[in-house]
Design a protein with these regions (language model features):
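Compact, Lys/Arg-rich rRNA/RNP-binding cores from ribosome-related proteins
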Residues: 24
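N-terminal glycine-rich anion-binding loops that anchor highly charged ligand groups
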Residues: 27-33
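Glycine-rich hexapeptide-repeat left-handed beta-helix
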Residues: 1-14, 19, 41, 47-68, ...
Length: 140
């Protein structure tokens, strides 16, 4: 069974038909929409701020979703896929986005809808990705 923990008195909330792998971790101020999935070794850690996930968000194996203390929560729109071993931190990801395997999305980034962040890319703090874009590289 997945590790689901209360942090600072706040327990994660889950929509209908969500799947959590046996060793996934979801803690604190996390709210998931319907039909989300969090796969093996993934961590969704709302310990120092909020994490809001829309419907049909897919968090692949080893991915980390976190937030920034007293600065930035993390908001993820509907139909988003977070690739294996990606890190998503204190940012906004609009609907219909793919965050590629091993990509890093840093604080205060805004990823527009229908965009792709390519595998292994690093999106630096305060970057605004326009809707329908493909971002790749280090830095992207």
């Amino acid at each position: 069974m997945a590790l689901i923990k209360r942090v600072h008195g706040i327990m994660p909330e889950f929509g209908e038909n969500c799947y959590l792998a046996e060793n996934a971790t979801v803690v604190g101020q996390v709210k998931m929409g319907d039909q989300c999935s969090v796969w093996f070794n993934a961590v969704v850690r709302g310990d120092v701020n909020f994490i809001r996930m829309g419907k049909k968000v897919n968090v692949q194996d080893g991915a980390i979703i976190h937030c920034t203390y007293q600065k930035f929560g993390t908001t993820i729109g509907n139909n988003v896929s977070i690739g294996h071993n990606a890190i998503v931190h204190g940012c906004v990801i609009e609907p219909n986005v793919l965050i590629g395997m091993g990509a890093i999305v840093m604080d205060n980034v805004h990823v527009g809808s229908n965009s792709i962040v390519a595998a292994g890319s690093v999106v630096l703090e305060n970057t605004i990705i326009e809707p329908g874009s493909i971002y790749a590289g280090v830095p992207a």
